[in-house]
Amino acid sequence: MKMKVFLMFVLLFLCSMGTKAQDLGANYNENIDYPITEIEMLKQSKVSWVRGFVNIPNLFLQNENGKIVGVKENAIRTHIPTLKFIQAKKALGDRVKFILSLKIPFELYTDTVPKVGTKEMEYIFQATEILLKTYDMAKNIEILVMGNEPEWENALDTDLCHADGEDYRAFLNEFANRLTTWKQANGWTFDIYAGALNRVSELPKSETVPAVVSVVNNNPNVVGLDLHVHALKINQAEDDFRIIRDKYGVTKKLICTEFSMVRALNPHVADALGEWGTKHGYTAGMKIYEYLNLIAEKANAGTPVSATEFKSLFESYSWYPKNWYKTFYEVFKKYDTYAITGRFSVVPGGARAVYDAKTEMWELGGIYFSRYLGLDADGFYNPNPLLYPDFIAARDGLAVSSLVGGQRELFISWGNGADKTGILSVTDEEGTEVVRRSLDSENDYTLVENLAPGTTYHVALLKSDDAVLWKDDVKTKSVTGKFPLLKYQQVDGYMLVQLLNLPDDVSSYKVKLDGQEINIVNKNLNGQILTAEVTYKDGSVEILSTTIRK
């Protein structure tokens, strides 16, 4: 019997959650270099998604007299924030999915939306293709969103009613088709979304909204729509989603990569503390922005105010929309929103280093709040007491805590919201139910094996009468190489071992940790050497080995 031996090293991916409907995530907007600085916070928070955007014209296009005249190729290939974005993805691993939005504000760089076929539009596509290839960006994102609030960025006047709707529709259709061609040529698997529309219930005359929706509804290369909700009133999230689903008839996936109630808060940034102030050791005449500056200084000095004090201030005002995060999340659930990314952290410094009477209070929408409430005993950011309880309730109430797909297997870690008397159903692309089993009441996970690589499966948790408790569509990983690869990652307290790229002539394999045989889902995380003995039908054995990295 001959022996084939390979020594392979892979990284341990410490991450938190996977993809299913209503997954929560972290939005970093243009600060795509920030996630790498908050890896431990992202792990601790158990978010499922990380989202950022890139301003294509501002960063990567040459502009002269309101016309796009070229591409800054070197600027794209040496863009350090792009590299850091990808480094964060690799540090977080398979279960945290990344979303990249492409911000293309035509109003600032051209007189109108360029026509399809013009040099200006070709420059946009050229820059995008180079960006997607740089640092393997395209291979590390799950979703690519074409556009970012185009109602404002394409508008030619202040009423937002004349925004080159037809030209923008043509642009998005051509963009989606180009992206699909690149995907096919390069083996990229990200999903294409259009968006991100904002305030749709306030813009009944907008040309841009129906143009974007038309592309979503009619272009088969577009998977769904990104919908932002920056609301003035707490019921606006419901209004926006209802209009998209009912009036415009969008049946494809929805995601929400930005949401806030900052517009309801901004008019009050200079409100006085009043009676609350005198009761808590401040003056009645102190303004909210002055209070925020003061407590930021205290947090920076290591003597932050208490979460109770901070929360009580805002809840003393009748205008503050209590539990707005919970209200929004209920809307996201109702309309089956696939991914939800809100502001994650508020740290010292940044664009709003000092507040004044005109500062917009975006930061009150952050989940973690070290700028105002400092760090806890373990060095982690203290949370925002106005939102954090609702964030935790939403996160921990999910039916699925983690969902990790390999090439031939699917690992599901059940969350607190799962009905353990339920039935797991897995259906293939032909509509054939390939798995139907009751959940194991003794285990908090389910491992589904013997799936086909590169195949989309519909996975659902059902009641006994087949009523759906939770569902998602999951695509197994495609075979990407000729040689077997041993991989592992930590998933909710388990080690999940995956053998990738196994050829058809494999008859069996064994996985061992420090010489002791283990299952591919293993509770022991304390070993040092992980090996897999792969036996082929001709009797040969291939040994794969990797060192566990803590």
Language-model features, listed with the residues they occupy:
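Pro/Thr/Ser/Gly-rich low-complexity, intrinsically disordered linker/stalk tracts
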Residues: 397-417, 453, 470-494, 546-549
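Short, flexible loop/turn segments at beta-strand junctions in immunoglobulin-like
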Residues: 448-452, 522-524
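Aromatic-lined carbohydrate-recognition surfaces of secreted/lumenal glycan-active proteins
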Residues: 146, 172-209, 253-263, 337-345
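Substrate-binding cleft/loops of secretory-pathway carbohydrate-active enzymes
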Residues: 197-226, 233-240, 265-274, 347-361
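Hydrophobic beta-strand segments within extracellular beta-sandwich modules
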Residues: 459, 530-532
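Aromatic- and acid-rich polysaccharide-binding/catalytic face
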Residues: 50-52, 100-102, 142, 148, ...
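Substrate-binding cleft of secreted/luminal carbohydrate-active enzymes
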Residues: 259-265, 270-397
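Substrate-binding cleft and catalytic face of glycoside hydrolase catalytic domains
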Residues: 39, 45-66, 76-199
